[in-house]
């Protein structure tokens, strides 16, 4: 089975929950933790990893707190000899049965870059209210890279939490310092994934992702980031154009036109409404023509129906995750003293130095 790569920073408590989940539900999983935490968190990480040493194979790679995030990931990827890697996070929980399906599929289909299931997002708010939403994933198997990119842009989704070819991940993170922009990164990563190769989606859940009001995240200060950081948005247009030339065989002029259309679509989603919030979306071809996405929504709705196969399959997992999420909020010292969010990695590093 492919190794799970988990970059982590100042969250030993959250990581303990994820590793505990893997130890309980998927013993013998192989995990690499790329730890870039501050010194005061080191002991917590050592204790966390020691707690699962008899059940999981965990390689703990420790980096200086100022060592850049994407460089940590690259260093860890370069230590792996396997063809396929599962990307994870210290607050997200993979469904390994879906990851195993993805691994088997990619081994037989070299023209696909990544494989994934849907994502169930849990968000714990300050009032202790828990919200849940579905993050869909679509099959993008058209032989034309330009078509895959255009279809993706209509109804984009996260492609990070998946099983992916290691060489493709290395390319992703080698250029990540150029492509990272809050509110745009998942979009640009997804376009790169579906331009460089095809995407495989399964109707089953691939990941349970969590957000905790006590944690610190990278996100835009406001929805007008595309105006405040317009130069960076234009840089993304050029990067997408180059991908369409290199992977899609388009001319420079045609690739530029397409990349402008792609970025305009992303901005329209930020400025107005996400596709699934637009009235009548459920009858739009973007949704209706994807049987996989419709199955994912049915599975998601089934989680809330007693006796539904989806609920029976995932109930123990969900109860564990929700319990850990609430426990972290009441007891954790993860990200202690940090802002709720930072717009850039530079701001995050400066904040550390200020302590």
Where are these regions (language model features)?
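A conserved acidic beta->alpha catalytic loop
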Residues: 34-48
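Active-site donor/metal-binding and catalytic loop motifs
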Residues: 120, 126-128, 160, 196, ...
């Amino acid at each position: 089975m492919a190794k799970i790569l988990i970059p982590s920073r100042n969250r030993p408590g959250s990581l303990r929950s994820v590793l505990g989940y893997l130890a309980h539900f998927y013993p013998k999983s192989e995990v690499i933790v790329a730890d870039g935490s501050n010194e005061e968190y080191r002991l917590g990480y050592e204790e966390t990893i020691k707690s699962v040493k008899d059940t999981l194979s965990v390689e703990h790679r420790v980096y200086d707190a100022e060592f850049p995030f994407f460089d940590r990931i690259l260093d860890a990827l370069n230590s792996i000899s396997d063809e396929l890697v599962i990307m994870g996070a210290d607050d997200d929980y993979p469904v390994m049965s879906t990851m195993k399906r993805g691994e088997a599929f990619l081994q037989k289909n070299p023209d696909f870059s990544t494989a994934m299931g849907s994502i169930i997002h849990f968000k714990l708010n300050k009032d202790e209210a828990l919200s849940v939403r579905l993050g869909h994933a679509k099959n993008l198997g058209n032989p034309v890279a330009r078509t895959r990119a255009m279809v993706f842009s209509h109804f984009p989704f996260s492609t990070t939490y998946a099983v992916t070819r290691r060489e493709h991940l290395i390319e992703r993170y080698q250029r990540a310092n150029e492509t990272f922009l809050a509110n745009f990164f998942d979009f640009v990563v997804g376009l790169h994934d579906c331009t460089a190769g095809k995407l495989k989606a399964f109707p089953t859940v691939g990941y349970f992702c969590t957000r905790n009001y006590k944690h610190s995240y990278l996100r835009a200060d406001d929805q007008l980031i595309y105006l405040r950081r317009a130069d960076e948005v234009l840089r993304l247009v050029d990067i997408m154009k180059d991908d369409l030339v290199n992977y899609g065989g388009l001319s420079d002029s045609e690739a530029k036109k397409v990349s402008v259309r792609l970025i305009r679509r992303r901005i329209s989603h930020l400025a107005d409404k996400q596709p699934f919030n637009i009235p009548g979306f459920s009858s739009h071809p973007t949704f209706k023509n994807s049987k996989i996405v419709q199955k994912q929504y049915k599975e998601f709705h089934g989680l809330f129906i007693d006796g539904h196969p989806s609920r029976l399959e995932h109930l123990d997992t969900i109860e564990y995750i929700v319990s850990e999420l609430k426990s972290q909020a009441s007891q954790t010292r993860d990200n202690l003293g940090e802002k709720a969010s930072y717009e850039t990695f530079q701001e995050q590093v400066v904040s550390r130095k200020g302590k």
